[in-house]
Amino acid sequence: MPKMFGTDGVRGLANRDLTARLALDLGDAAVRVLGDAGTQDDQPEGRRRALVGRDTRVSGDFLASALSAGMAAGGFDVIDAGIIPTPGIAFLTSVLNVEMGAVISASHNPMPDNGIKFFARGGFKLPDQKEDDIEAVLGQDWDRPTGAGVGRVSHDQTTATNLYIDHLVATIAPLNDDKTQPKPLKGLKIVADCANGATSVVAPEALRRAGADVIVINASPDGYNINKNAGSTHPEQLQAMVKATDAVMGVAFDGDADRCLAVDEDGNMINGDQIMGILARAKQREGKLNHDTLVVTVMSNLGLKLALKDMGIKTVETAVGDRYVLEEMLKGDYSLGGEQSGHVINREFATTGDGTLTALTLCNEVVKSGKSLKELAADFPQLPQTLINVPNVDKKAASTNKRIQDAVAREEELLGDTGRVLLRPSGTEPLVRVMAEAATQAYADEVCTRLAKIVAEELAL
């Protein structure tokens, strides 16, 4: 039986793969596994609590109701925070000291999909073992509470949202002694593309409270338009709007706002690698980049690593997935990490990738540095990169096939220090991703095409 939890929780087609019944069972199982982390005396009035939030997909309503029902039936009082970014639930799980948090979202996926991910006390995503434990007891009967032992479900989107926005603004603009709000972004004209998703209220409000002049697009969710030709996966509107309005930059979020990409004043995309480079150098300048190290994944561009090396900043690599980035950050006491896709974890303020926090911090660095985003990003040039997905192959054999490994070694020898290759099996599909970076796009294309051909020939199902 295939593993239910993927790299970011449980995902699938809502009402087909991810049903109300499954959401109910997941809530029930999560109570059994995560409820063991503490005793009922840990919480006010002896009741254990869970926090649930969601993005703007229409299926989020019935899935939230079912998930909450499973938790309440297991004896947890559930606070339904309504529509709120994923990192908002992580933050509130920590500050409200609830036993666990859960988010119903499929992030950047199309609207028909949805997903469920959990946070343990403290606001951290679950390790693989805890997800395995939940899966192991899924659907099993157990001695559930009765009578006064069952939980209640309450709804409080306003309080949850306001607490989260206050936190975000305070990361770059803590209140003055007289309780007035500083405006560090005053005069900064930016465009924010909210993907018609969970940060449609949060990001514009946080940026404006910090003083920015914000032009907002794709912030009218209707349940069906999340990520539709909008946000970080479709930045064309943002690029055009930045140029049309003479904004100094733009920021784009995905559906649950755990990632952020940016656009400079000319409409050029600034990816997660470049954003991490800019923020790492800023933290280094302020003495806040622990061990002068940035945590990245194997997908981060070699150009980033070479540029950081010249600045005296080391990089540590992990597998793809912000949960693995965080695990490495905690293990090595590192303060900043992330992914090329725009997940950036700033441990000073967050326990997971937070797109709105990234946008605020990036805007603040533009102001502090006195440079444009284009100028800042230019210090982190990206090597040309080619990625080819090779479908319908035995992905598990990629690392042991001799012809493939010999071909990889040969290409690496030819590239030397001017590029690299990477073969990465998909976590969810029978395919292998072949990536090559080189000094020119043409050479990256050549290398990637040669390797993809060999992978297809050797591993075809």
Swiss-Prot record:
The free-text note explaining how the cofactor binds reads: Binds 1 Mg(2+) ion per subunit.
Query: What biological processes does GO assign it?
Result: carbohydrate metabolic process; peptidoglycan biosynthetic process; UDP-N-acetylglucosamine biosynthetic process
PTM-bearing positions, type Phosphoserine = S107
Q: Which organism is it from?
A: Bifidobacterium longum (strain NCC 2705)
What Enzyme Commission number(s) does the record list for this chain? Answer: 5.4.2.10
Q: Which reaction does it catalyse?
A: alpha-D-glucosamine 1-phosphate = D-glucosamine 6-phosphate
UniProt function note: Catalyzes the conversion of glucosamine-6-phosphate to glucosamine-1-phosphate.
> NCBIfam families annotated for this entry?
glmM (TIGR01455)
- Active site at S107 (phosphoserine intermediate)
Record protein name field: Phosphoglucosamine mutase
What domain of life does the native source organism fall in?
Answer: Bacteria
Homology family: Belongs to the phosphohexose mutase family.
- Got a GO cellular component term for this one? cytosol
Gene3D superfamilies annotated for this entry? Answer: Alpha-D-Glucose-1,6-Bisphosphate, subunit A, domain 3, Alpha-D-phosphohexomutase, C-terminal domain
Q: Which InterPro entries match?
A: A-D-PHexomutase_a/b/a-I, A-D-PHexomutase_a/b/a-I/II/III, A-D-PHexomutase_a/b/a-II, A-D-PHexomutase_a/b/a-III, A-D-PHexomutase_C, A-D-PHexomutase_C_sf, Alpha-D-phosphohexomutase_SF, GlmM_bact
The record's listing under HAMAP family reads: GlmM_B (MF_01554_B)
Query: Which cofactors go with this protein?
Result: Mg(2+)
Q: According to its UniProt record, how is this protein modified after translation?
A: Activated by phosphorylation.
Entry keywords, A to Z? Isomerase, Magnesium, Metal-binding, Phosphoprotein
Chain residues that bind Mg(2+): S107, D254, D256, D258
